[in-house]
UniProtKB/Swiss-Prot annotation:
Stored Pfam families: BioT2
Protein name: Coiled-coil domain-containing protein 7A
Start-end of each LRR repeat: 161-184, 1310-1333
Annotated organism of origin: Mus musculus (Mouse)
Lineage: Eukaryota, Metazoa, Chordata, Craniata, Vertebrata
Keywords, comma-separated and alphabetical: Coiled coil, Leucine-rich repeat, Repeat
Region feature (Disordered): 21-51
Note: Oncogene that drives tumor growth via increasing proliteration and cell survival.
């Protein structure tokens, strides 16, 4: 309730109000009480309640009625209310009793005294005064009490109102009540009550305030919501109070201020969030605990199983011992019997020997018993060790769970399986070891039995079973200590340690077989060491090196705790960050270096022995060929996905993979025992597509070149690999000269560098028949060459893959090193490195571009060496497969995620198909590269195939440039650093290595630094959107939307920054073009097409398009509209030529929406085409601007402009140009058209001078003074007349009504100008506006009207007439005046419209025809007055012209019937009024309300105002629309003048009061002002464009003049009050300006 504010203001008044009425009553009583009362009532000096009752609707009753007692009880305690009321009542009662009772007693006493004393007069008077004083004192006291009661009531009221207001605002009483210390429940109850009461208040107050009525709907909605606030707040408060954590917050907020419902809801939301987080934590904890519990259960079960297995084994061993003992006993019995017989026979001879033999047997038996005991001990020890291992596993599991709760489920599964397998394998090993020993003693039968027993034993998820044969090599001594078991298990773990995902995928057979091979190795080492291995001693094992992902793991006899950790780290290698990955790569590289060549041969032996070990990573028992095929399948779908929309590319990519397979298979000799060379090739290929592309291109080259590139797929793959190799090449080649974006990717990566190299190399590569094939061939040769050269330099071919691998790994760790190495090893190795690394770091880019020529030079040499080196390269590639065991699987993931259809685009494909493919693919590939994170061990060269030059450039044109600006140079930013292992993680700069970050940050600048030579200017202007525009035309063809958007963005910048400059620059050309249209109209496109064509040029001819920047010069020379020389390249512009280029004009077209369409075509034509001197609004035009400056006093100064963007043309002229183009002129006589042309030219010149005077102060008027303005003006007029003729011929775009004749009354005008030059001060004032004697005016009018007849046809040339000299304009005006005089009656109906353009006429007709008629009449009267003035005498010549024009106007009057109302206010009528007004100038102020023109002002003042006001023409157009008046077109000269100085006249329109000062203006002055006032017709022209009439075309030029000079007048129109200070210019100043304006006319 906002009403409380009113009571607050009222309260100050009402609280003290009631005393004053009593004061006034007391004042009437006696002087003494007055003094007393004044002393007492100083505090209440406000008006009395009686005199000032509260306003209606704000009385206390208004607030008192709606408040029920229940609320008062709530807000103010009942006790307090009762106390206040009782105290107030007691005070009142006591005071009243005292007053009245005392008065009554005193009266009795006085009566008694009077009766007793005899009623003396003095006593009576004194007693009366005393009584009065007592009454007054008592009354004052009563008044005070009443005031106190009223104040208390009002305060209570105000409290109630404020409380209701607070309720209405936030229902925030809750906090206040809390501050009062009340409970939340009571607060809620009160709030509910208050809400109800508040609704009651609303219902009552709605009827009393309109504001409340306007907001009834909102308040009803509020009322509906308030119903729910009670319950809501109850719940909220209960919820908040229930949470102690938030109580402090609620308290602080309640103390600080009343929190809104939103804050409370926010609190609740926070509480819910906290609870949700707690619940989530609890759930997570529960899950973790459950997982732990399950793990413990599994461990417990495993322990139980192990226990049962061990017990079973102990039983078995015991049974075996029993069997052995029984057999021995039997043998001993048998042997004893036989020996007894023999002994009996030979007892005599052999008795000592027999004893000895029996002793030996006993010893043997004892030894065997000891052995059995030791075996028993070993078994017991193994049992203990197994139990300890189980405990260790538990601890490890707990540790793992603690570290990685998230990964726990997966790890728990895998670890449960591992632990079970470990325990089982250990138990089985122990079982197997015992059977081995027993087998050695008892025979092979035991072996079979034990193996059968083991197979029969229960097995749970065993990853591998140890064949007894695998353990046979271990001597029985190794089992005497249980330390051997951890060694074997560790060895098995090290072998089988792999990502748990792969283990899950692995089949039991493959892993069981995999374990066989590794166990042989420890068996050999154990055979070498017959003694038990100590725990610290590590067995002699091969290093299990995984260069791509895995650290080489050495098998050692360390406890299983550490080994399990190692296996876990190996399984977690996938998730390692780039730093860990770098470390792994470095270690792998060091190991590779140590291994050297032996690693390859070792790998061969390993493949024979432990190929299954590596299959643990790949999980395939099949041949390497099958494994490779799977990798290639992963490849194929990846490429397939990348190029599914582009089947050709997909087919290529598949072809490339299959090619590599087939080719490597063809080279079976190189495949050796490795499966297929393509196996290693496939693995490596994904490790780095650069290396793949090398191996593929190399193998393919060996295959395809040896096979002659049999299939297109091979050729395409060759091109792909070549492009991969030459991604750095092709972009460099491509960007310079390809019209089709070959470079797209490379251009993105290294667009700038590529530009320079591209031009140089682009010609070479493009000159070839199918550059794709040749380049692919060259690159395919070069790739093997690179590998060859590197291999040669390193001394052998096989290590090349290691070098490639190490280099690829180094390329991530130290790509810069690899780049330097590649440079050292030659451009070929450099290309190889760039391929293998895929990095194509800026160095590799530049080197690749350089390498192009070098590769071409060495092509023949290297081709010869290709066949030689190709085989070792393949071998190396094959070796690489096993180094990168998981590359196939990784590559599948990457292949799925990498949509690089490595774009092995068919050379045979049409450029268009390639274009379509290429456009979409590069972006996807880039995105995918970004998605990849450089965590994997294998350096994945993101194999951007720059399709041969045709399509790279298609996408190149916009994407590379945009990326250059954005700095997203993916190619330069080392795409290769993104390894295959972590495709899921984005290669964001945060994830990249610091090197990679550096490259990523550098790449944009590097790319920006280099631009194609044709785009040289764009280099300086890096961030201008025009760079993107200027790249190439195909951009618009393929992606018109993108280019259009870019263009519009650029234009938006220009609009924001230099819109005004562009407008100003364009307008002079528009003016010029209007003059020039006649000559070049044939060559010009039509207005609708010209604008679009220009935009297409700006988009399409981007090579030529101007890159617009803030510091750039927008003006350049146009050699051709369609063949645009690069606009930015030309900083300077020759003065005489049209400076605006088509591209800029198109931009300006978009910028200047209102600008006439004709101007766009006109701008392009240089002014030289015109034989006559064109009026150049620009500073340094070849045409003599010497006479164009308006200020004679200022010496001409060269104008040096940093940018052509800012034109010297006034905004009024620009708007005139805008409006004039679309006008539909009415046909009139040719003479009138000529007059209008001259008027237009004169106005333009005057405007030019005004603008130039403001801007540069250049003035060639001095020359005119020396030479005589007459000659210059005559020459210019005569020269301009043919222009008008040409305009008439060529201005197809002009409306027929605007067509103007070439005939000119310029001679008379010139004569009049000469007269004006020679006139005295007073005469000059009149002559400034060219209004000469009435006779001259009549002559001009007589001549003019015939011309005005043609104006109907050529009304569009009113603009050109505006370019006419002021003399021509004056002649027209004078002619019109004479005509108006002769045709006053007719003109009252018709002629006024005739002189105005159709648009202006319509505006005048529709807006204020009656007003215009009145104004025209006044103007006519004033003109008559001016004619009477001595200064008007020279106007006779102009009057003659006007008389001539009258005849023409009479012809115009017929079509102008609709505008007759405006014409009724002809200048003749105005002159009449002026004649009357001379005498009645004093009375004119009264008429000023009707008379809009500042006729009182001298012509010089008006001219000055015109000159000064001209700079505001832009406002004039806007305001001119407001000034539909200026009705008299015959007064157009006055209107023209008024257009210049029209701000005054317009203010007169609005104010009219100001006129009396200006009413004294001479006829010329008034006409000038009227003429100035016409600038409104410019807007009229816009509006009148609807009106086809434009009956007085002469007036339209005058309006245009006013538009040029009108800006001030426009301000006067809109503001009315603001008039230029120059309105009161002296006649001399006005004369000077007019002379300057005349001189400026060419």
């Amino acid at each position: 309730m906002k009403c409380a504010k009113h009571p607050s203001t009222i309260s100050m008044k009402l609280t003290s109000v009631p005393e004053l009425p009593y004061k006034k009553g007391l004042l009437n009583s006696s002087p003494k009480p007055k003094e007393k009362h004044n002393a007492k009532s100083k505090y209440g000096k406000n008006e009395s309640m009686v005199l000032r009752s509260p306003p209606t609707g704000e009385s206390i009753v208004r607030f008192a009625l709606p408040i029920p007692l229940s609320k008062t009880k709530d807000k103010i305690s009942a006790d307090e209310m009762v106390r206040r009321i009782t105290t107030n009542l007691k005070m009142v009662v006591s005071n009243l009793e005292d007053t009245y009772g005392a008065c009554y007693d005193n009266g009795e006493k006085a009566a008694e005294k009077s009766e007793a004393e005899g009623l003396s007069i003095g006593d009576d008077v004194s007693s009366f005064l005393l009584c009065c004083s007592q009454f007054t004192s008592q009354l004052e006291e009563a008044v005070k009490e009443e005031c106190g009661a009223l104040e208390s009531l009002y305060k209570w009221f105000q409290q109630q109102v404020n409380q209701m207001e607070e309720i209405s605002k936030d229902q925030s009483n809750l906090e206040e009540l809390q501050s009062d210390g009340k409970t939340a429940s009571l607060n809620i109850v009160q709030i509910a009550k208050l809400a109800r009461k508040f609704e009651d208040f609303k219902s009552r107050l709605k009827t009393r305030k309109e504001v409340m009525q306007t907001k009834n709907e909102d308040k009803e909605i509020m009322a509906e919501t308030l119903k729910h606030y009670g319950l809501m707040e109850k719940q909220i408060e209960e919820f908040i109070t229930s949470h102690s954590a938030l109580e402090s917050q609620t308290e602080t907020e309640s103390q600080s201020g009343t929190p809104s419902v939103t804050t409370r809801m926010a609190r609740m939301i926070k509480i819910f969030e906290n609870q949700s987080t707690m619940l989530e934590k609890a759930l997570n904890d529960q899950q973790t605990i459950e997982s732990k519990y399950k793990q413990l259960e599994t461990d417990f079960q495993m322990l139980i199983m192990e226990k049962t297995l061990l017990e079973a084994e102990i039983r078995r061993l015991r049974e075996i011992e029993r069997v052995k003992s029984a057999a021995k006993e039997e043998q001993t019995k048998k042997s004893g019997k036989s020996e007894k017989k023999k002994f009996k026979e030979k007892e005599k001879n052999l008795s000592p020997n027999r004893e000895f033999k029996s002793i030996e047997e006993l010893l043997q038996i004892q030894k065997e018993a000891e052995l059995l005991k030791t075996e028993k001990k070993t078994l017991q020890g193994q049992l203990k060790w197994a139990l300890e291992e189980a405990e260790r596993n538990k601890t490890q599991l707990e540790f793992v769970l603690h570290q990685k709760m998230e990964m726990f489920k997966e790890e728990s599964k895998t670890k449960v399986g591992q632990s079970q397998n470990k325990s089982k394998v250990k138990i089985e090993d122990s079982k197997d070891s015992l059977p081995k020993k027993s087998d050695t003693q008892l025979g092979g039968q035991r072996k079979d039995q034990i193996s059968s027993d083991q197979s029969k034993r229960p097995k749970k998820k065993q990853l591998a079973d140890i064949d007894p044969s695998a353990v046979e090599d271990f001597p029985p001594e190794t089992f005497k200590s249980f330390t051997v078991m951890p060694l074997i298990e560790e060895h098995r773990e090290s072998i089988s340690s792999q990502p748990k995902e792969e283990m899950a995928k692995a089949s039991e057979q493959s892993e069981a077989e995999d374990i066989e091979g590794p166990l042989e190795i420890p068996s050999e080492s154990s055979n070498e060491d017959d003694d038990l291995l100590p725990e610290d001693e590590s067995p002699m094992m091969e290093q299990v090196t995984d260069v791509g992902r895995y650290k080489s793991i050495y098998i050692s006899a360390e406890p299983i705790d550490t080994m399990s950790l190692i296996s876990r780290t190996q399984s977690e290698m996938e998730t390692l960050e780039a730093i860990n990955y770098d470390n792994v790569l470095n270690e792998g590289e060091e190991q590779d270096k140590k291994i050297g060549k032996d690693s390859d041969t070792g790998r061969k032996s390993k493949r024979k022995r432990s190929s299954k070990i590596r299959k643990l990573s790949t999980h395939e028992e099949e041949s390497d060929i099958v494994h490779y095929e799977e990798a290639t399948k992963a490849k194929v779908p990846s490429k397939k996905r990348a190029s599914d929309p582009y089947g050709d590319e997909a087919y290529e990519s598949r072809g490339s993979v299959s090619k590599a397979q087939t080719y490597t298979k063809k080279q079976g000799t190189h495949q050796r025992g490795r499966g297929s060379a393509s196996d290693a090739y496939g693995d490596e290929a994904y490790e780095s597509r650069g290396s793949i592309s090398k191996a593929q291109t190399y193998t393919r080259k060996q295959g395809t070149h040896q096979r002659g590139r049999g299939s297109v797929q091979e050729e395409e793959s060759d091109t792909v690999h070549y492009e991969e190799v030459t991604r750095a090449k092709v972009p460099s080649k491509k960007q310079a000269s390809d019209p089709y974006g070959d470079e797209a990717y490379e251009s993105q990566g290294s667009v700038s560098k590529a530009h320079t190299h591209t031009k140089k190399q682009g010609t070479h590569q493009r000159g070839r028949g199918s550059v794709h094939e040749e380049e692919s061939d060259t690159m395919n040769y070069e790739v093997p060459r690179k590998s060859k050269i590197s291999s040669r330099r390193k001394g052998f071919a096989l290590p090349i893959t290691h070098q490639v691998e190490m280099h690829s790994s180094e390329s991530q760790g130290s790509i810069s090193k690899s780049n330097t190495e590649t440079k050292k090893q030659g451009t070929h190795k450099r290309g190889r490195d760039s391929d293998a690394d895929g990095a194509r770091t800026p160095v590799s880019q530049g080197s690749d571009s350089k390498a192009d020529t070098e590769r071409k030079k060495h092509r023949s040499k290297e081709e010869s060496t290709i066949s030689k080196d190709s085989i070792p390269v393949l071998d190396e590639v094959q070796d690489k497969t096993f180094e990168h065991q998981e590359s196939g699987l990784r590559l599948e993931v990457q292949a799925k995620k990498l949509t690089f259809s490595s774009q092995n685009i068919h050379n045979e494909e049409s450029a268009t198909d390639i274009k379509v493919e290429y456009q979409n693919v590069p972006s996807s590939s880039q995105v995918q590269l970004k998605k990849q994170k450089p965590l994997g061990g294998e350096i994945f060269t993101t194999h951007f195939v720059v399709p041969a030059e045709s399509h790279a450039q298609l996408y190149q044109t916009h994407t590379p440039e945009t990326q250059i600006e954005r700095g997203t140079t993916s190619g330069t930013a080392r795409l290769t650093t993104i390894p295959v292992e972590h495709p899921k993680k984005e290669a964001s700069p945060d994830n990249l290595f610091p090197e990679k970050k550096l490259y990523i940050t550098r790449a944009p600048t590097q790319t920006k630094k280099q631009y194609p030579p044709w785009d040289a200017k764009a280099e300086t202007q890096k961030k201008t959107v025009k760079e993107v525009q200027g790249i190439s035309e195909p951009q618009t063809k393929l992606n018109p939307t993108m280019s259009g958007i870019i263009l519009h963005l650029d234009m938006d910048r220009v609009v924001e920054t230099d819109l005004e400059n562009l407008e100003e620059t364009i307008v002079p050309h528009v003016l010029r073009s209007e003059l020039e249209i006649g000559t070049d109209a044939k060559n010009m496109p039509e207005t609708p097409t010209s604008r679009e064509a220009v935009r297409t040029e700006a988009k399409g001819n981007q090579d030529v398009t101007i890159s617009i920047a803030k510091g750039m010069k927008l003006i350049g020379k146009l050699k051709d509209q369609h063949g645009l020389s690069s606009f930015a390249s030309k900083d300077t512009i020759s003065p005489g030529k049209s400076l605006i280029k088509s591209s800029r004009d198109n931009q300006d077209d978009s910028l200047l929406e209102t600008k006439p369409q004709e101007n766009t075509s006109d701008k392009y034509h240089p002014s030289k085409t015109f034989p006559t001197k064109v009026i150049n609004m620009l500073p340094f035009s070849e045409k003599s601007l010497g006479s164009t400056s308006a200020n004679v006093d200022v010496a001409p100064k060269p104008v040096y402009r940093a940018s052509r963007g800012r034109s010297r043309i006034s905004k009024a002229l620009q708007q005139l140009l805008k409006t004039s183009e679309h006008l539909k002129p009415t046909s009139t006589k040719n003479q009138n058209a000529d007059l209008e042309k001259h008027l237009y030219i004169s106005v333009r010149s005057a405007n030019k001078h005004t603008q130039k005077d403001k801007k540069h102060g250049q003035s060639n008027n001095q020359k005119l003074k020396k030479q005589g303005a007459l000659s210059s003006t005559k020459k210019q007029k005569h020269k301009e007349q043919p222009k008008t003729e040409t305009i008439v011929e060529n201005n197809d775009k002009f409306d027929d009504n605007l067509m103007m004749t070439t005939s000119s009354p310029n001679i008379k005008i010139i004569k009049e100008l000469s007269k004006t030059l020679n006139l005295d001060g007073g005469d000059i004032e009149l002559s400034d506006f060219v209004f000469k004697t009435a006779s001259a005016a009549k002559k001009l009018e007589n001549k003019g009207p015939s011309k005005t007849k043609n104006l109907n046809k050529e009304s569009s040339r009113d603009i050109h007439i505006l370019h006419l000299t002021t003399s021509a304009i004056r002649t027209l005006l004078l002619d019109e005046e004479a005509k108006i005089r002769s045709l006053e009656k007719k003109l009252m109906k018709q002629s006024t419209i005739l002189q105005k353009s159709v648009s202006s006429m319509k505006k005048f007709m529709f807006e204020e025809p009656s007003r215009e008629t009145k104004m025209k009449r006044k103007k006519r009267e004033k003109r008559k007055i001016v004619v009477k003035s001595p200064h008007i005498l020279p106007i006779t010549t102009t009057q003659k012209h006007t008389i001539k024009e009258k005849s023409e106007i009479s012809n115009l009057e017929k079509p102008i019937v609709r505008g007759t109302d405006i014409l009724k206010k002809s200048t003749s009528a105005r002159k009449k009024r002026v004649l009357k007004g001379k005498s009645k100038s004093a009375t004119l102020p009264k008429k000023c309300d009707n008379f809009p023109f500042d006729l009182v002002r001298s012509s010089s003042d008006s001219s000055k105002q015109e000159v000064e006001e001209q700079p505001k023409p832009g406002n004039v157009d806007k305001k001119v629309s407001d000034d539909s008046y200026s009705p008299d077109i015959s007064t157009t000269p006055t209107k023209k003048h008024t257009l210049k100085g029209q701000s005054k006249s317009r203010t007169i329109y609005e104010k009219g009061v100001d006129l009396p000062n200006n009413l004294v203006l001479s006829k010329s002055a008034s006409s000038i002002q009227e003429f100035e006032e016409q600038p409104q017709p410019g807007n009229v022209d816009k509006k009148v464009s609807d009106d086809s009439y434009s009956p007085d075309i002469s007036t339209s030029p005058t309006k245009k003049h006013t538009l040029k000079g009108q800006p001030k007048s426009e301000n006067s129109d809109e503001k009315g009050i603001k008039r230029p200070n120059n309105l009161h210019m002296s006649a001399s100043v006005a004369r000077k300006r007019l002379l300057k304006a005349l001189s400026t006319i060419p």
